[in-house]
């Protein structure tokens, strides 16, 4: 046929059997990739430390999606929450991966069958004997079936009526686990961070889809609408399908980047806005203040801060710190976290508590500045020592650790104080192992960043695809050079005045 690469899909334009075949093959490829990727991730995943080396630090991409839907156990005997299991059941991580691969193989065979047996009676119009598809009817069928699946997911899987529920956690990502969720039918259901909205919205959207599907199965479109929207043209289906996909991709890019109940931080890592707003830092200070109010010492109050909470308050876990073309997991960047050293509190020689100004997200380097409780600069690490007035040496800054591995340890040596002041710019201070993975010390993004970038990019690409194919189907006659009035234009004597359609002669 000699088609150029960008025209090859025309071979299935008027061939319903093989159109179905290539779509089944596409499903086989998607399911096969998902299953294979899951097995690869399971082969390299280390479940030993869910607090300091969780899945998102290791660059896992499909494991978080399985986990949020209720899969927590492995046939390897481990649980995602850190415990051990003796009987993981059929729906373990490996079981789900295997099911996808088996399904992929079946789809592969079905695609071959439909490619060979393409000329089926079901695709023939009994009036003309030519291949054709009743697209409005097919639309109704698909809408009905997707509505049933959507309703079933919300009413059974999420609620735990027949299924495990979904991953639910507290606002600080500390107590996450899989549990049933009751639908939220009030205004709270519209809060993107309320898990109950997932159940209620799937039930509502599924019900709407079922009703809309039945409507489109029982009511034929008006002729004017059918022709106006080119409902008989398969490219209309392509255009509207691309629209649905790019819209969904934009939505999930938003829910992933800004955070929601569907993207828990325990599975995908924290969002950049939690660093920007000092979200975890405020909670840590609140807990310490509450401890001090109960007559605990500073050391006791800081020692009760969960290591998991402290780890979230570290800039290396900010997905916006990773460069666009830095491949690899977060662990390949700053290393594998070993332990929390504790919270450093700096003081000058007059006993004032000093706070290190934290590095904003989009800075690679940032001056080390220490301010007091009123925001007044009291110390810094100067660029030019000759002109310095607030250097650590001049101000006599000391540092003492509370909580963590260095609890109770203090330093007055200026070089050591400056070292910890630089590290305090990056949030809570952790011991990081950079030797095991030969980590290069350059921050990487988390799967949250990759997912957002990928879906936003493809959404933009698919948006143009929707415009392209929509224009092709709406203006097909124009692009083909076929004008409905063309025959009248060239017919001798059709108009009293040449080229003026308002002077058309009446047929005798």
From Swiss-Prot:
GO terms for cellular component: chloroplast thylakoid membrane; photosystem II. The keyword Membrane applies. One of its GO terms (biological process) is photosynthetic electron transport in photosystem II. It comes from the Eukaryota. Its main location: plastid. It is a multi-pass membrane protein. GO terms for molecular function: chlorophyll binding; electron transporter, transferring electrons within the cyclic electron transport pathway of photosynthesis activity. SUPFAM superfamilies: Photosystem II antenna protein-like (SSF161077). The chain crosses the membrane at residues 21-36, 101-115, 140-156, 203-218, 237-252, 457-472. InterPro entries: PS_antenna-like (IPR000932), PS_II_antenna-like_sf (IPR036001), PSII_PsbB (IPR017486). The keyword Chloroplast applies. Belongs to the PsbB/PsbC family. PsbB subfamily. HAMAP family: PSII_PsbB_CP47. PSII is composed of 1 copy each of membrane proteins PsbA, PsbB, PsbC, PsbD, PsbE, PsbF, PsbH, PsbI, PsbJ, PsbK, PsbL, PsbM, PsbT, PsbX, PsbY, PsbZ, Psb30/Ycf12, at least 3 peripheral proteins of the oxygen-evolving complex and a large number of cofactors. It forms dimeric complexes. One of the components of the core complex of photosystem II (PSII). It binds chlorophyll and helps catalyze the primary light-induced photochemical processes of PSII. PSII is a light-driven water:plastoquinone oxidoreductase, using light energy to abstract electrons from H(2)O, generating O(2) and a proton gradient subsequently used for ATP formation. This is Photosystem II CP47 reaction center protein. It comes from Coffea arabica. The lineage of its organism: Eukaryota, Viridiplantae, Streptophyta, Embryophyta, Tracheophyta.
């Amino acid at each position: 046929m000699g088609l150029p690469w960008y025209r090859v899909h025309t071979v299935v334009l008027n061939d319903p059997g093989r159109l179905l075949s290539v779509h089944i093959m596409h499903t086989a490829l998607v399911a096969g990739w998902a299953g294979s990727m899951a097995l690869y991730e399971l082969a390299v995943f280390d479940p030993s430390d869910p607090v300091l080396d969780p899945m998102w630090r290791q660059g896992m991409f499909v494991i978080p999606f399985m986990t949020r839907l209720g899969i927590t156990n492995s046939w390897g005997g481990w649980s995602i929450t850190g415990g051990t299991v003796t009987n993981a059941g059929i729906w373990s991580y490996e079981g789900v991966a295997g099911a996808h691969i088996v399904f992929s193989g079946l789809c592969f065979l079905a695609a071959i069958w439909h490619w060979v047996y393409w000329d089926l009676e079901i695709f023939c119009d009994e009036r003309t004997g030519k291949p054709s598809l009743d697209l409005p009817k097919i639309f109704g069928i698909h809408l009905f079936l997707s509505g049933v699946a959507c309703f079933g997911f919300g009413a059974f899987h999420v609620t735990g009526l027949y299924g495990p529920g979904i991953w639910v956690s507290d606002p600080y990502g500390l107590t996450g686990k899989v549990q049933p969720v009751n639908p939220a039918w009030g205004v709270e259901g519209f809060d993107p961070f309320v898990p109950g909205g997932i159940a209620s919205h799937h039930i509502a959207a599924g019900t709407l889809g079922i009703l809309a599907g039945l409507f489109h199965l029982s009511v034929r479109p008006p002729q004017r609408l059918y022709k106006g929207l080119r409902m008989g043209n398969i490219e209309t289906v392509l255009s509207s399908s691309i629209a649905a996909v790019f819209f969904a991709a934009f939505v999930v890019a938003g829910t992933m980047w800004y955070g929601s109940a569907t993207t828990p931080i325990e599975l995908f890592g924290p969002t950049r806005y939690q660093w920007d707003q000092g979200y975890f830092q405020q909670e840590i200070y609140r807990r310490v203040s509450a401890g001090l109010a109960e007559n605990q010492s500073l050391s006791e109050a800081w020692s009760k801060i969960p290591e998991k909470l402290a780890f979230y308050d570290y800039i290396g876990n900010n997905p916006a710190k990773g460069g666009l073309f830095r491949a690899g997991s977060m662990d390949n960047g700053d290393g594998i976290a070993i332990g929390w050293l504790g919270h450093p509190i700096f003081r000058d020689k007059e006993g004032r508590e000093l706070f290190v100004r934290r590095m904003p997200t989009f800075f690679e380097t940032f001056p080390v500045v220490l301010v007091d409780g009123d925001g007044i600069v009291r110390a810094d690490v100067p660029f030019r020592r000759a002109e310095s007035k607030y250097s650590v040496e001049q101000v006599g800054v000391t540092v003492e650790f509370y909580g963590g591995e260095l609890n109770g340890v203090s330093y007055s040596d200026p070089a050591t104080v400056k070292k910890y002041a630089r590290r305090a710019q990056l949030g809570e201070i952790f011991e990081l192992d950079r030797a095991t993975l030969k980590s290069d010390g350059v921050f990487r993004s988390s799967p949250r960043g990759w997912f957002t970038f990928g879906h936003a990019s493809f959404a933009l690409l698919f948006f143009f695809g929707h415009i392209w194919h929509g224009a092709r189907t709406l203006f097909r006659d124009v692009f083909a050079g076929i004008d409905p009035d063309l025959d009248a234009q060239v017919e001798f004597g059709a108009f009293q005045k040449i080229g003026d359609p308002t002077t058309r002669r009446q047929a005798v």
